Amino acid sequence: MNKDAMSKEEKKVTDRINELYHKKENEGLTPEEEEERKELHKKFLANFRAAFKQDVENMVILDKNGKEVTSEKAKQAQRKKGLRKD
């Protein structure tokens, strides 16, 4: 994910994950902090997967001759979102 495109909430989650990582490395985490770390990690992965899926679904693939070779699954997703008219 592009750091410039990261929302304030995503940045907050990432910063807190990093804080907890460094604390874990230096002094260890309390059980509550370990649980928080796990939940933040789940949230981070869900956000990452959603952004990645959106990027892939919006992608148009061309071969070296300029012919579109986008997968049918991606084309269907694009049609469903109104991004494609064919």
From Swiss-Prot:
Subcellular location: Cytoplasm
Keyword Cytoplasm in annotation: yes
Listed GO CC annotations: cytoplasm
UniProt xrefs under InterPro entries: DUF896
Magnesium found in the keyword field: no
Keywords: Cytoplasm
Highest taxon above the source species: Bacteria
Basic residues composition bias: residue spans: 76-86
Signal peptide: none
Biased composition (Basic and acidic residues): 1-27, 65-75
Region annotation (Disordered) ranges: 1-36, 65-86
Gene3D superfamilies linked: Helix hairpin bin (1.10.287.540)
Pfam families documented for this protein: DUF896
HAMAP family: UPF0291 (MF_01103)
Similarity remark: Belongs to the UPF0291 family.
Protein name (database record): UPF0291 protein LBA1279
Source organism per UniProt: Lactobacillus acidophilus (strain ATCC 700396 / NCK56 / N2 / NCFM)
